[in-house]
Amino acid sequence: EHCIGNPSQGLQRIFTKPKSKSHNSLPISELPKFISKVDASEGVYPSTVLAMKFMILTFVRTGELRFADWKEFDINCAEPLWVIPGERMKMGKTHHVPLSRQAVSILEDMQQYSGPKGYVFPQVRNPKKPMSNNTLLYFSNRLGYAGRNTIHGFRSTVSTVLNESRKWHPDVIELQ
């Protein structure tokens, strides 16, 4: 009645584990040109441009950016901060993102498009919904980076720069 052995035992020798593919990322040397193209883009919603710049400055995951809510931000203080709730984080722990003055400036600009409540980066046509998962990727592709860069790849770019600087411990960088 009960199975004595494991019928799948030994299958790991037959099937190989798929290799994980890293996200395409721009070399840091190309980032200034990319940002210039973002700034010069035409026919793109201003909120999309601001979201791209904010994502580059904070190097958060796309989902964290898309679902960012105004109540998570404290920007009117000496040390502006974004506190991302654990339920939205990959590791399930609350995450604190210090904000540069440039990031704060982007948030201040975004208020004219999204208002002071709800999603910081909402859909243009339906502000009660977050920005589409593909908005920033399509924007990057439109700038001529299709296949060369993924939005998640910016995290790789920043991680490489920070690790090569040797100013921070690799474990601390990985936590960001």
Stretch-by-stretch model annotation:
Residues 33-37, 74-126, 139:
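Basic, alpha-helical nucleic-acid-contacting "clamp/cap" segments
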Residues 36-48, 58, 97, 111-125, ...:
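Short, basic (Lys/Arg/His-rich) helix/loop patches that form interaction surfaces
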